Structure formats: C-alpha cells, structure tokens
C-alpha cells in the first residue's frame, strides 16, 4: 500500500472544530461533577438498582442481537435475491428512527391490544411495561448495529475456505462451525460490544414501551432523567459514569480493529 498523501492545511481547521464540538460537552460534564460526593452519588440504592438492571437487560439484549443478527448479516451478505436486497433498508431502519417511534411501534406490536400482544395476553403473557419489554426495546434499536458491523466481514471472510471445505466433503453444518464462525468471530465480538453499549444507553424506546418502574424497567438512562429534576448532582455523576463506560467500549472496539489492518 502507498503511504497517504499530506492533507491541505485548511482541512485541519474544521477537523479541530469538530473535535472540540464533540469533546466540549463531555469536558463540561466532568467539570460539573461534585467530585467529593461522586462515589456516594453513584452508589445510592436507586442508582445501583438502575445500573444493575441496565447491565442485565443490555447483556440479555446483546445475546438476542447475536442470535438474530449473525444469521441476518450472513443472509444479507451472501444472498443475491431481490427480496433480501429489498429487506435490507427495513432491517437497518431502526438506525435512523427516533427511539420513541420505535417504542410506539413495539407497543402496538407487543402491547395488550397490539398485533401480537393481544394473543400473548390471551395466553397469560404480558410483555409491555415489564423487564422483558426493556430487553425487546434494547434489541430493536441495537440489532442493526451488530448487523451492519458484521455484514461487510460476512460478505468476504472465508468464502474461499468454505468452498474448499465443501469440495473436501464437509457438510454445511461443519463448514459453519469449523470455518465460517471462527473467521467471523472478531466481527461478532466487535458488533456485540457496540450492541451492548447501545443497549446500555437506550432511553426513548424503553420509556415508551416499558415505562419507568423502579427495579423493573427503570434503567440507568431513565434514572438520570428523573434525577435531573430531583438531584442534578446525581444526574451529572451518573451521566459521567455512562460516558466512561461508552468510552471504554469505543476504546475496546478500536483496539480490536487497528487502522490499516486488512481484514480479508
């Protein structure tokens, strides 16, 4: 590969302005934190309950994203049918939908009178405004992140090896477990981390579809929203906690995908 050419100097000015624009609000949060009380603010019973619920539901939604997203990414990447190509925008739509719209859509799908929810309700299964609703809301908004991060790798990774394995007599299931999945594993890990981070910070769809019941559906973003009115210092401290978690996630993903690495 040829080394990149030097950029014009004027390019650095808007680049620096963009960096400052992104960094300034984060720095403002750190400055605003009541540091002597920081640990006490993030370890109150309500904060701990919300954090634990967020981690549990984000982990559950990440598992769902992997179970659903890996096959979806493979189908999108490998299938050449028109139907699959036409479904791609639909699958990625939650990326651009306002989260509150996603929450309303889930409510009318899985709510008591929803398209599917009415039958579940008749069977004694209630999803809306429960912990399961939190998991579904997080999965709805996070699934496209895993799919889109894995689709590119699924399109090229291991195709030649799969053909060789098949010509040697390996069954499709064996090819999947022994060839395809190991080659996709780095992408699955990166996509899972992104999905977990997105689930951890989900707010709008959760509030609309699951509500804000303490210990049941009140995740950390909802706790921050409520504390913003009753205890602004606690809201700032919890916000910084989420910023740190998100930063660790971004650094972790960046460490797994070094710049200039050829992933083919």
From Swiss-Prot:
One protein family per Pfam: BPD_transp_1
Compartmental location: Cell membrane
Chain ranges of the ABC transmembrane type-1 domain: 51-253
GO molecular function term, any single one: molybdate ion transmembrane transporter activity
CDD domains: TM_PBP2 (cd06261)
Keyword line: Cell membrane, Membrane, Molybdenum, Transmembrane, Transmembrane helix, Transport
This protein's record includes keyword Cell membrane: yes
SUPFAM superfamilies, sorted: MetI-like
One Gene Ontology cellular component: plasma membrane
Membrane-protein topology: Multi-pass membrane protein
Function: Part of the binding-protein-dependent transport system ModABCD for molybdenum; probably responsible for the translocation of the substrate across the membrane.
Sequence similarity: Belongs to the binding-protein-dependent transport system permease family. CysTW subfamily.
Name the UniProt record assigns to this protein: Molybdenum transport system permease protein ModB
Species this chain originates from: Mycobacterium tuberculosis (strain ATCC 25618 / H37Rv)
């Amino acid at each position: 590969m040829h080394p990149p050419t030097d950029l014009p100097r004027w390019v650095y000015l808007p680049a620096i302005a963009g960096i400052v624009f992104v960094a300034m609000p984060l720095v403002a949060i750190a400055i605003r934190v009541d540091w002597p009380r920081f640990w006490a603010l993030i370890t109150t019973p309500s904060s701990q309950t919300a954090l634990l619920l967020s981690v549990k539901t984000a982990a559950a939604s990440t598992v769902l994203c992997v179970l659903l997203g890996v096959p979806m990414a493979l189908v999108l990447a490998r299938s050449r049918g028109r139907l699959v190509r036409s479904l791609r925008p639909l699958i990625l739509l939650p990326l651009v939908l306002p989260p509150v719209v996603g929450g309303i859509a889930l409510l009318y799908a899985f709510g008591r009178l929803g398209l599917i929810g009415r039958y579940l309700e008749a069977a004694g299964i209630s999803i809306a405004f429960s912990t399961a609703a939190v998991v579904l809301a997080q999965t709805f908004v996070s699934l496209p992140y895993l799919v889109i991060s894995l689709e590119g790798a699924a399109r090229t990774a291991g195709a030649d090896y799969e053909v060789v394995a098949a010509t040697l007599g390996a069954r499709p299931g064996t090819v999947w477990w022994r060839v395809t999945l190991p080659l996709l594993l780095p992408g699955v890990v990166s996509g899972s981390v992104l999905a977990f981070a997105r689930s951890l910070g989900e707010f709008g769809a959760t509030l609309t579809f699951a509500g804000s019941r303490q210990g049941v559906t009140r995740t950390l973003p909802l706790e921050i929203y409520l504390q913003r009115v009753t205890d602004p210092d606690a809201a700032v401290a919890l916000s910084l906690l989420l910023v740190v978690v998100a930063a660790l996630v971004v650094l972790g993903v960046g460490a797994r995908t070094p710049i200039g690495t050829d992933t083919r």
